[in-house]
From Swiss-Prot:
Protein name, UniProt field: LexA repressor
Record bears the keyword Ribosomal protein: no
Record-stated family: Belongs to the peptidase S24 family.
Source organism: Bartonella henselae (strain ATCC 49882 / DSM 28221 / CCUG 30454 / Houston 1) (Rochalimaea henselae)
Subunit and partners: Homodimer.
């Protein structure tokens, strides 16, 4: 698994070579990654080489070749943008792009996919294709598979979730009453709401009086994941 800085450098080298035909210089890499010394770039390149993503060609200046890319980013690498969080709202911890959380020596960073945009009701296809990636300190999420979604409405505003926030979701198919979930309705429509189990029915509650509460038979609802946090960029 790549750290956030390793991923960022690999992406930068690939795109630079695609645009210019030559690898970037160490100074260009240092500037792009906002590092203060070339030694940090040397360590990142060594780590990428050891993991089989790049190789250095001997006796040639600026001779770095990208051998392969992580599978999750090869589909749309030229337009992908890595997002670093500014605020993680579930524990109010602030992170800056230059924070030690994203330093080369920090080995507990992970990259999760942003799988589309979610609203009160969208087709399932809206969250089935990765549109971006998100770099997070690993200690901010729990065990399991995670993904992110961009919020596109104000249906959960009274729960502190705003339009354009990015929500972090742990993939799971069960939930406790009162938790905010991603739900698939009738295998066609996806929504994110507060989950309530009441007898032989499931209630999905918005956190905005302008949106209706929906009640379903259990067989119509499939839980796709549970909200564990959100990121808000200022």
């Amino acid at each position: 698994m790549l750290t956030c800085k390793q991923y960022e450098l690999l992406l930068f080298i690939h795109n630079h070579m695609k645009e210019t035909g030559v690898p970037p210089s160490f100074d260009e890499m240092k500037t792009a990654l906002e590092l203060t010394s070339k030694s940090g770039i040397h360590r990142l390149i060594t780590a990428l080489e050891e993991r089989g993503f790049i190789r250095r060609l001997p006796n040639r200046a600026r001779a770095v070749e990208v051998i392969r890319l992580p599978e999750k980013i090869t589909f749309n690498l030229s337009s992908a943008r890595k997002i670093s969080p500014s605020v993680i709202e579930n524990n109010k911890r602030k992170i800056s792009k230059n924070s030690d959380n994203f330093d080369l020596e920090e080995k507990k960073n992970i990259i999760i996919p942003i799988m589309g945009r979610i609203a009160a009701a969208v087709p399932i296809s809206a969250i089935q294709q990765q549109i971006n990636t998100l770099c997070l300190p690993q200690d901010m999420i729990s065990l399991g598979e995670h993904y992110a979604l961009e919020v596109k409405d104000d249906s959960m505003i009274e729960a502190g979730i705003l339009d354009k926030d990015i929500i972090i979701v742990r993939r799971q198919n069960t939930a406790t009453s009162g938790e905010i979930i991603i739900a698939l309705i009738d295998k066609e429509e996806v929504t994110f709401k507060r989950y309530r189990r009441k007898g032989n029915s499931i209630t999905l509650e918005a956190a905005n009086p302008h949106y209706e509460t929906r009640i379903y038979r259990p067989e119509r609802v499939q839980i796709q994941g549970k909200l564990i946090g959100l990121i808000r960029k200022y």
